[in-house]
Amino acid sequence: MTDSSVGIGCETALMLARNGYYTYAGTKNLSQARDLSHISKEEKLPLRIIKLNINSTFSVGFAVKKILKEQQNKIDLLVNNMGYVLLGCFEDVSINEMRDQFETNFYGTVRTVRSVLPFMRKHKSGKIINVSSIAGRIGFPVSSAFVSSQFAIEGLSESMRIELEPFGIHVSIIEPGMVRATNFMHSMVIANKAKKPSSPYSNITRKLTKNIEQMIGMGISPREVAYTVLKAAKSDYPLPRYIVGDDAAMIMENRKSMTDTEFDKFVKNTILNV
């Protein structure tokens, strides 16, 4: 499990361990996983916290090698957590900021999957669960970099699902809407240019950021996402996609039933209140 120190990652690691999975909870910063460590020790869970920086090929390789050594060269389940959200209209996002967004959200997933895949293929079994977002299916304003990274995860997952099926490996995507978590805003980064009042997009950026803060309070619990991951992990035939949350389900239903023009208007009314 990647990015396990807080929020969805923490709840998912605990959910899996509480249901009998020997869980390796990866985190870039071990000091941020103190709560997870405390709960795990208190409940005597089969969970180990390991240092894992998904932006480093060496770190991912080292962590996977360690796990394989302890688990007789077998990994049954890989859960890739979402990463972070870069806010800012496209023109306000620099090339380097866009690249950093993809480096974590997309290439981080690529690194972990490439590291475990040969061993899953050898055993002709395994599950890969990528926690994405409803933003991987729909474009939203002021988040073009994040949305693009999630679309990339969706495309990668769909392609891998077909490629890996002959080897007994299942690939699923978890698509939550807004998640109610105290750390959620900390997982958001505003592009440098988007912070400036001189930006031609400053009004829309400010409005969206304010609305997101309000919507988070009405979002689903991270535990609900964790339960969905567990459901996919336990299934002999997991679904390609799991939409999590009433807001996500409602958005997808509207996307199917509306024209592009109608849906654009719906997004502006819902997200921007215009």
Identify the residue ranges that each predicted region occupies:
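Residue(s) in the substrate-gating loop at a strand-loop-helix junction
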Residues: 133
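SDR active-site lid
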Residues: 166-239
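Substrate-binding pocket helix/loop in short-chain dehydrogenase/reductase
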Residues: 89-90, 97-99
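The beta1-alpha1 cofactor-binding region of Rossmann-like NAD(H)/NADP(H)-dependent oxidoreductases
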Residues: 52-62, 95
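Conserved glycine-rich Rossmann-like NAD(P)H-binding loop of the short-chain dehydrogenase/reductase
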Residues: 19-35
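Active-site helix of classical SDR
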Residues: 113, 149-152
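Conserved glycine-rich cofactor-binding loop
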Residues: 5-7, 29
